């Protein structure tokens, strides 16, 4: 098993933000939104009523934009710790004409200022692998979720060996530039395994059945707070 090698917590240069935004995340983002909406629908129809969603680690806001373009009947508070990402996110939100539906905020998701039980749903795509102590983020995301709400977190899954990692880079970033390939490689090294996520869920009192491997490179938590 590959050891976890941490990468920088914040991608806060203009080059990183622009390179990240230019990578083709469209298929992954569509699947994320499909699955998030399904999770809300399964939770007593949350996806069909106005609600406020918190997006942790929004990056350049591609997923909130995809969500709102599906005519989602709610709003999104989209957060990131990187100012450079939020600059690009603001441009993307304005270009999509979604300023009234998506609020961009600077947040450290390890220490959120929000009160307990603030949001109807919390979603996050690929923030966990950036965090040295991922339980800190997952604890906060669970805390700000209302009872009855849905926590939906998806992230990269660390492969078992270097050959598998190299295969994933070739498969999913083979046509990317050198910097983009480097970012993807480092993210895979920094990612958690499903068993490591389950250990954290036990500590937080969240069902371990809520996390599953959902692709050859992703795990997903889908949990309803009682």
Where would I find each of the regions flagged by the language model?
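Conserved alpha-helix/loop element of class I SAM-dependent methyltransferases that forms part
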Residues: 26-49
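A short acidic, Gly/Pro-enriched loop at the edge of an enzyme's catalytic core
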Residues: 110-121
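N-terminal, positively charged/glycine-rich alpha-helical extensions of SAM-dependent methyltransferases
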Residues: 1-21
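Class I SAM-dependent methyltransferase SAM/SAH-binding core
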Residues: 54-56, 61-111
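A short SAM/SAH-binding and catalytic strip from SAM-dependent methyltransferases
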Residues: 121-133
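C-terminal alpha-helical "lid/dimerization" subdomain adjacent to the S-adenosyl-L-methionine
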Residues: 156-204, 209-213, 218-219
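Conserved beta-strand signature within the Rossmann-like core of class I S-adenosyl-L-methionine
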Residues: 149-155
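A short glycine-rich, Lys/Arg-flanked "PGG" loop and its adjoining helix->strand segment in the class I
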Residues: 136-147
């Amino acid at each position: 098993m590959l050891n976890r090698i941490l990468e920088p917590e914040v991608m806060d240069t203009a080059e990183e933000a622009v390179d990240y935004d230019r990578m083709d995340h469209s298929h992954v983002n569509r699947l994320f939104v499909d699955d998030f909406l399904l999770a809300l629908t399964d939770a007593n129809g949350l996806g069909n009523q106005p609600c406020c969603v918190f997006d942790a680690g929004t990056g350049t806001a591609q997923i909130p934009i995809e969500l709102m373009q599906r005519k989602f009947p709610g709003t999104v508070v989209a957060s990131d710790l990187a100012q450079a990402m939020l600059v690009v996110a603001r441009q993307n939100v304005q270009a999509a004409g979604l300023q009234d539906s998506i609020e961009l905020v600077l947040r450290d998701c390890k220490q959120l200022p929000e009160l307990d039980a603030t949001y109807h749903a919390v979603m996050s795509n690929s923030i966990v692998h950036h965090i040295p102590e991922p339980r800190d983020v997952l604890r906060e995301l669970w805390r700000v979720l209302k009872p009855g709400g849905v926590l939906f977190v998806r992230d990269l899954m660390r492969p078992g060996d270097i050959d598998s990692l190299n295969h994933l880079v070739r498969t999913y970033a083979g046509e990317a530039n050198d910097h983009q390939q480097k970012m993807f490689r480092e993210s895979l090294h920094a990612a958690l395994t499903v068993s490591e996520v389950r250990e954290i869920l036990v500590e937080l009192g969240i069902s371990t059945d809520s996390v599953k491997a959902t692709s050859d490179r992703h795990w997903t938590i889908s949990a309803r707070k009682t």
